[in-house]
């Protein structure tokens, strides 16, 4: 609409004028740039700066609420023009032109004359306020650096391996390179990577630490670690970023309407935020989700944007992976940078990043998604958007096949054209006064944007297909087979990067998926052994029962007997992991029917609070044995917060390999084409990671004791024996439920 207004403004109206000036305060030089919507050369020789604003609100109301900062923007442009004229132009008109979206004749003009002296005072006040912010940040940096001069490790003693991890982290930062760390759960990895990186703030190797994790429990642990360092005297600012939809304080149905016309927390945001941040930073150093919500509610501002603005002023920022790696929602400063940034990157639970990155760089659009939005759009104003959606639905309906999947070499051009038409009509709808549209449209708009942002024509690491149901096309899919180049490219933009996890085995597999090289496996890898005594654990492998899908019903009684013989020998808490929800239910019903144990099962789609309540059931030394029935690879497979010494044992039923299917077979073919073992890359290794993560729930502290039982005939195969050698070289093989009982009885008797 801006262009339409500019084009209709006459020949003396010069649109989109770039402006620039330099301001030297003596110790700071600012290069100030902007682009005026328009400059008008009036008949009398005077100039007018025009700033165009559009809205769907009542123009008078919109003007009254926003004129101060709208006019302020135009006044800065006017000041630059007069300043650059070197005194030849003494005054200028400043105009703010308000237009109703989609109605060029419905307008409100606010115009005022200003002299250079008036504008110069205005600009100087703003500039000096901005410089004060810069200096405040500089003062904080000086205070921070001074405070870490004598910063001690925040705990009385180092655990085994911690000093090695600190030294390795320090080396990676000093070399400005990438490192990979495999260190067991319970060693205290978080403090060992943060401590040396924080100590290096003073050396100028980093100006900000990005700490990435996909788990809320690990986010809390990182905040707790920073808090411990602050209590040791470090003047650090830290903020944890929560997903926009999670932290949004609007009611359901309005969470995606992020504009000042509809959201009370977006209204007047930028006129409030500076004072809010100054006040917040004067009161505390560390901000979690609850802190941010409290500040946002008190000041009626957007909590998500507040967290991002606090991050600008923070030394340590804790994010989900998508904030750095997602091509759609990633931080623009990182995503758009071609140069190394003065930041460092810490990636926790790094074994999860490759699969998450594949999700970020893949997309799927379903016919049903478009159909649902079509039915929810109402009113005459939505007619053109609905028509665009009908065209897309028709595109699906015209494609027919007796196959389930049609392989493509690229996304069809006609489909891309239809998607762009959908985007255009959606934008037109949003500009209309009082336009109403459901959250489902906002979600679909985001999905289409993400789809079009991906490579649309054949790339070696991409696969394209259309799926069919009952002979009709029902979805189109862009599938990223390998995201390692994107992980490598983005992590290259940081001054130094450390990937760390309790599970990076097999090492060659994970380092390659994280964008590393063969050389990295030798020179940039730290593999720390477990600091916990092996005598405190019993690791058994029952490799007799077949857990292949076709054999599961037959082997179920044998599997359940082995589990029973293990859990009956010591009163306590046990987690039992199964290959599917259906299989888990069968096991749960059998054990529940015995009446001997307290049986608690994982439910489908549990909320965060329901998960916490589930875990709270497992207290140390319960009166009756508690059995937790869980799905292998599910929400309780890793990154959970259990009470100390909560578990006495874990049983893992199956090797955890994903179901044989088209997507995984494509991965298999892709890696086979690169000369690697395709089956291992697509099936064995992802499944084995689930197994090891689940097994790691037991021994988490020096004085923990427990039993681990793996059940699946495939654990007896040579490839799994080799994988288990890297993690559990002390395991024993058992051939019957009776042997499980005897070994378990002996273990607990020796440790009673």
Features from the language model and the residues they span:
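Mg2+/Mn2+-dependent nuclease catalytic core
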Residues: 21-123
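Conserved pre-motif I regulatory segment
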Residues: 140-182
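A substrate-engagement module of RecA-like helicase motors
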Residues: 145-148, 152, 205-317, 325, ...
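Walker A/P-loop
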Residues: 174-196
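Signature of the SF2 helicase/ATPase Hel1-core->accessory helical subdomain module
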Residues: 220, 224, 297-423, 502-516, ...
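A contiguous, basic/glycine-rich beta-loop/short-helix subdomain that forms a polymer-engagement track
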Residues: 292-312, 317, 328-335, 427-546, ...
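Conserved RecA-like P-loop NTPase helicase motor core
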Residues: 532, 543-554, 604-716
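Conserved helicase motor "Helicase C" RecA-like lobe of SF1/SF2 P-loop NTPases
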Residues: 579-603
């Amino acid at each position: 609409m801006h262009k339409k207004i500019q084009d209709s403004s006459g020949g003396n109206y010069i649109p989109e004028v770039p402006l620039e000036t330099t301001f030297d305060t003596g110790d700071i030089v600012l290069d100030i740039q902007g682009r005026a919507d328009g400059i008008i050369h009036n008949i009398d020789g005077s100039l007018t700066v025009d700033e165009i604003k559009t809205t769907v609100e009542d123009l008078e109301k919109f003007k009254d609420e926003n004129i101060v900062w709208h006019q302020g923007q135009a006044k800065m442009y006017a000041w630059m023009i007069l300043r650059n004229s070197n005194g030849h132009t003494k005054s200028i008109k400043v105009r703010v032109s308000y237009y109703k979206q989609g109605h060029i004749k419905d307008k409100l003009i606010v115009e005022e004359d200003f002299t250079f002296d008036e504008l110069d005072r205005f600009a100087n006040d703003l500039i000096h306020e901005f410089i004060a912010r810069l200096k405040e940040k500089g003062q904080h940096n000086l205070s921070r650096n001074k405070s870490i001069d004598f910063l001690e490790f925040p705990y009385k003693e180092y655990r085994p391996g911690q000093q090695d991890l600190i030294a390795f982290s320090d080396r990676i930062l000093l070399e400005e390179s990438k490192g990979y760390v495999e260190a067991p759960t319970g060693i205290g990895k978080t403090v060992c990577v943060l401590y040396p990186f924080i100590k290096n703030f003073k050396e100028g190797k980093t100006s900000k630490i990005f700490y990435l994790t996909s788990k809320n429990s690990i986010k809390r642990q990182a905040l707790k670690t920073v808090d411990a360092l602050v209590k040791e005297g470090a003047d650090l600012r830290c903020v944890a970023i929560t997903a926009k939809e999670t932290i949004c304080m609007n009611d359901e149905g309005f969470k995606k309407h992020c504009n000042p016309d509809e959201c009370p927390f977006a209204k007047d945001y930028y006129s409030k935020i500076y004072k809010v941040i100054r006040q917040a930073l004067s009161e505390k150093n560390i901000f979690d989700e609850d802190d941010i919500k409290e500040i946002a509610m008190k000041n009626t501002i957007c909590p998500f944007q507040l967290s991002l603005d606090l991050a600008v002023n923070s030394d340590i920022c804790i994010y989900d992976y998508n904030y750095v790696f997602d091509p759609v929602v990633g931080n623009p400063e990182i995503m758009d940078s071609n140069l190394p940034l003065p930041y460092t990157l810490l990636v926790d639970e790094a074994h999860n990043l490759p699969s998450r990155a594949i999700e970020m760089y893949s997309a799927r659009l379903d016919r049903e998604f478009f159909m649902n939005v079509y039915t929810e759009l109402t009113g005459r104003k939505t007619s053109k958007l609905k028509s665009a959606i009908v065209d897309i639905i028709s595109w699906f309906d015209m494609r027919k096949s007796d196959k389930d999947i049609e392989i493509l070499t690229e996304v069809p051009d006609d489909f891309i054209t239809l998607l762009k038409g959908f985007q255009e009509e959606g934008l037109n709808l949003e500009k209309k006064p009082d336009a109403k549209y459901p959250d489902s449209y906002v979600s679909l708009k985001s999905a289409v944007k993400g789809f079009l942002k991906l490579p649309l024509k054949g790339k070696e690491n991409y696969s394209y297909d259309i799926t069919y149901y009952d002979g009709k096309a029902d979805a189109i899919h862009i599938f990223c087979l390998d995201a390692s180049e994107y992980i490598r490219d983005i992590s290259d933009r940081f001054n130094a990067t450390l990937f760390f996890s309790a599970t990076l085995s097999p090492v060659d597999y994970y380092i390659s998926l994280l964008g590393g090289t063969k050389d990295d496996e030798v020179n940039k890898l730290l593999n720390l052994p477990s600091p916990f005594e092996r005598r405190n654990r019993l690791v058994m492998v029952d490799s007799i029962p077949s857990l292949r899908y076709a054999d599961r019903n037959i082997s179920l009684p044998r599997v359940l007997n082995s589990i029973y013989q293990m859990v009956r020998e010591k009163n306590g808490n046990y987690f039992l992991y199964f290959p599917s929800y259906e299989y888990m239910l069968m096991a749960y019903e059998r054990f529940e029917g015995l009446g001997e144990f307290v049986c608690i099962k994982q439910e489908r789609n549990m909320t965060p609070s329901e998960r916490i309540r589930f875990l709270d059931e497992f207290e140390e030394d319960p009166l009756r044995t508690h059995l937790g029935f869980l799905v292998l690879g599910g929400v309780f497979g890793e990154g959970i917060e259990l009470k100390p010494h909560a578990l006495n044992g874990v049983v893992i039923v199956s090797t955890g390999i994903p179901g044989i299917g088209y997507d995984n077979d494509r991965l298999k073919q892709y890696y086979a084409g690169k000369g690697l073992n395709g089956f291992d890359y697509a099936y064995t290794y992802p499944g084995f990671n689930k197994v090891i993560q689940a097994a790691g729930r037991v021994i988490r502290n020096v004085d923990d004791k427990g039993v681990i039982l793996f059940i699946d005939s495939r654990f007896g195969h040579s490839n799994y024996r080799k994988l288990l050698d890297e993690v559990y070289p002390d395991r024993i093989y058992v051939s019957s439920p009776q042997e499980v009982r005897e070994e378990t009885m002996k273990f607990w008797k020796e440790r009673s």
